[in-house]
Each structure stands twice: as structure tokens, then as C-alpha cells.
């Protein structure tokens, strides 16, 4: 259940497949066909599992950890009060990056920001990167499925431009 980058109060069910991709229309229709028109009360059991350590290890395996450590980076991370709070910053710290995390430890909306990694909501990250002398800033949306960035001069890099950088 997520509101993604929308203001508080907007929630929906966002279905992802096992590989992280969006469900295709056939899967959505099959799911809709099994749903009751009205909520039903079902009691049952559940169990919790701490999947974070394995997930973080998997994410870290995609990068050259030694090169990151050797670079002695300083980065600003802005999870915008959303789902990435603590996780992205902790992952970068484990890779030897000096991290200043802003807009963490609170629900998005406390500072009247929209958890969307686009202008003007990235202004605080832009300022903090320059003030801290950081080499970059990373900004995630509310459910951490999109990312924006800021360069060392405080200039915004749109999520669509990041894909071009990754592919280049």
C-alpha cells in the first residue's frame, strides 16, 4: 500500500512482480476477479521476516564497493520522509560514504514537502549539498521507487536524466 509521491491521504495498492517489474494487465485482471466487492473479515496467522539485510547485500552487489570506499565520498541523502529513510543512508555508510541525511525520521508532510524528487521539492537537498561541500545529493520519492540527484554545485538532475547517465 503506497501513496508514492502523492500527499498524505492518498493510498493505493501497488502490485509488483517477483522481479520488481509492474504487473501486466492479465495479472491485474486475474487479481481483480478474485477480489470481493466489499471487505471481508478474515482472521488468520502471519509471520514477519527481516528481509532488509539480504536486500541490502543484493543491492550492494551491483556496485564496485572498493571503488566507492576509495573515493572518500560525501553525499547528502533526502528520503523526503518516505520509505527510504535510513536504508539508503545506511547502505552508503556501509560502503564508506560520509552521509548527511535530511528529511528523515518523520512522516512526509511535516515540512510541507511533497515526496516527489523533482523541483521545487529538492531545494533543501540542493542547498545542503552546497553547504556541506558534498559531491552529490540523492533524493527518493515517498515509496523509494524513483530517485533524483543533485550535483556538487547544487544543480538538480531529473530522474529521467539519471537513466541516461547510467546507460552512458
Where are these regions (language model features)?
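General beta-strand structural signal in soluble alpha/beta enzymes
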Residues: 1, 77, 99-103, 139-140, ...
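Active-site microenvironments of hydrolase-like enzyme catalytic domains
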Residues: 1-18, 140-153
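Acidic, glycine-rich loop-and-beta core segments that form the ion-binding/anion-interacting portion
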Residues: 114-168
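Short, flexible micro-motifs
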Residues: 6, 23, 85, 145, ...
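Gly/Ser/Thr-enriched, mixed-charge loops and adjacent short helices
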Residues: 11-132
Amino acid at each position: 500500500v503506497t501513496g508514492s509521491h502523492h500527499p498524505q491521504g492518498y493510498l493505493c495498492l501497488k502490485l509488483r512482480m517477483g522481479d520488481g517489474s509492474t504487473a501486466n494487465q492479465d495479472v491485474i485482471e486475474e487479481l481483480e476477479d478474485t477480489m470481493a466487492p466489499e471487505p471481508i473479515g478474515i482472521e488468520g496467522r502471519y509471520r514477519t521476516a527481516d528481509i532488509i539485510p539480504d536486500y541490502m547485500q543484493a543491492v550492494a552487489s551491483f556496485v564496485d564497493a572498493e571503488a566507492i570506499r576509495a573515493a572518500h565520498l560525501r553525499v547528502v541523502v533526502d528520503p523526503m520522509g518516505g520509505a527510504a529513510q535510513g536504508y539508503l543512508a545506511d547502505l552508503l555508510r556501509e560502503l564508506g560514504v560520509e552521509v548527511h541525511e535530511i528529511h528523515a525520521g518523520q512522516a512526509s508532510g511535516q515540512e510541507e514537502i511533497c515526496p516527489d524528487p523533482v523541483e521545487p521539492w529538492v531545494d533543501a537537498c540542493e542547498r545542503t549539498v552546497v553547504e556541506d561541500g558534498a559531491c552529490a545529493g540523492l533524493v527518493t520519492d515517498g515509496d523509494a521507487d524513483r530517485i533524483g540527484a543533485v550535483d556538487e554545485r547544487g544543480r538538480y538532475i531529473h530522474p529521467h536524466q539519471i537513466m541516461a547517465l547510467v546507460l552512458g
